[in-house]
Swiss-Prot record:
HAMAP family: AIRS (MF_00741). GO terms for molecular function: ATP binding; phosphoribosylamine-glycine ligase activity; phosphoribosylformylglycinamidine cyclo-ligase activity. InterPro entries: PurM-like_C_dom, PurM-like_C_sf, PurM-like_N, PurM-like_N_sf, PurM_cligase. It catalyses: 2-formamido-N(1)-(5-O-phospho-beta-D-ribosyl)acetamidine + ATP = 5-amino-1-(5-phospho-beta-D-ribosyl)imidazole + ADP + phosphate + H(+). Pathway: Purine metabolism; IMP biosynthesis via de novo pathway; 5-amino-1-(5-phospho-D-ribosyl)imidazole from N(2)-formyl-N(1)-(5-phospho-D-ribosyl)glycinamide: step 2/2. It is found in: Cytoplasm. Its EC number is 6.3.3.1. GO terms for biological process: 'de novo' IMP biosynthetic process; adenine biosynthetic process. This is Phosphoribosylformylglycinamidine cyclo-ligase. The lineage of its organism: Bacteria, Bacillati, Bacillota, Bacilli, Lactobacillales.
Length: 340
């Protein structure tokens, strides 16, 4: 019995793995950017940092996955956008520290290697990289029968970016009186899906709920996470932003305080938060307490900026989209986030 046949009998299809590599090459090529060295398939991805033109470069990295949103992608057999979610979760974190994304690596683990499906996943990763300006310089696809079911897969990503040392955003510049500006989310993004799946466990996904403005439930639930790089990067370059919070797991309550010192707090005007219909539906059908919604979800604001009052107009000029003045930074009395 040949080694190939022995491996195949154990559930690993080497030929399918080779096919995946061939299928994804055209998608990876879309992400090419200055600084990339070498070709896909090497033992390590290479990047020439000198090509960035940054004088005092500081590398900033992030890693994340998409949680149980993957289970809905599998349930609805829609795999072409979940990769964008993975990229977004990573690059939105590092842009919050002031980094321009340079490159990205992905990791896909599955119970059965299905080349057509995995191509869709990686195509989504590539689309996310294009939106973020990051090169997809490497990755790993692992077929692990026995670890995962045949239809199951998991996805994780790793982003590396660069910032000028003087432009790092670490919360030290946020001060009392700063204005809090919110940038709209595209939907739930990629957190809170264990609760989302429980709320809609008995739904097929084809439903058009009255709150969802004519959209099918499954399309709203799988709406890809917005990538904020192109919106935020010009603001960082002009040093117009004192703090940035990526609103992910933990909602407003956990994420907003991550962008300022312990003696400060955020005062949020709830009436100015552009709450999306899906959050109203979740609160209603899930019988979730209103205040708890802000502890779990982004509620319609995926990125929050702390900006000096004198810079607010310039920030709005640079952002080609609605910008929501949702609050301000105050001295902390008790809670780190006060929603009024």
């Amino acid at each position: 019995m040949s080694e190939k046949n022995a491996y195949a009998k154990s559930g690993v299809d080497v030929e399918a793995g080779y096919e995946v590599v061939e299928r994804i090459k055209k998608h990876v090529a879309r992400t090419e950017r200055a600084g990339v060295m070498g070709a896909l398939g090497g033992f390590g991805g290479m990047f020439d940092l000198s090509q960035t033109g940054v004088k005092e470069p500081v590398l900033i990295s992030g890693t994340d996955g998409v949680g149980t949103k993957l289970m809905l992608a599998i349930k609805y057999d829609k795999h072409d956008t979940i990769g964008q979610d993975c990229v977004a979760m990573c690059v939105n974190d590092i842009i919050a520290a002031g980094a321009e994304p340079l490159y990205f690596l992905d990791y896909v683990a599955t119970g059965k290697n299905e080349p057509a499906k995995l191509e869709q996943v990686v195509a989504g990763v590539a689309e996310g990289c294009v939106q973020a300006g990051a090169a997809l310089i490497g990755g790993e696809t692992a077929e692990m029968p026995g670890m995962y079911g045949e239809d199951d897969y998991d996805l994780a990503g790793f982003a590396v970016g660069v910032a000028e040392k003087s432009q790092i955003i670490d919360g030290s510049k946020v001060k009392e009186g700063d204005i809090l500006l919110g940038l709209a989310s595209s939907g739930i993004h990629s957190n809170g899906y264990s609760l989302v799946r429980r709320v809609f466990a008995d739904y097929t996904g084809d439903e058009v709920l009255p709150e969802l403005e004519g959209k099918q439930l499954k399309d709203v639930l799988l709406e890809p996470t917005r990538i904020y790089v192109k919106a935020a990067l010009p603001l960082i370059k002009e040093e117009l932003v004192n703090g940035i919070a990526h609103i992910t797991g933990g909602g407003f309550i956990e994420n907003v305080p991550r962008m300022f010192a312990d003696d400060l707090a955020a005062e949020i005007d709830e009436d100015k938060v552009p709450v999306l219909p899906i959050f109203k539906a979740l609160e209603k059908y899930g019988d979730i307490k209103h205040e708890e919604m802000f502890e779990i979800f982004n509620m319609g604001v995926g990125l929050m900026l702390a900006v000096s009052p004198e810079n607010v107009n310039r920030v709005k000029e640079l952002l080609d989209e609605p910008v929501y003045e949702i609050g301000r930074i105050i001295k902390k009395a008790d809670a780190s986030v006060v929603i009024k």
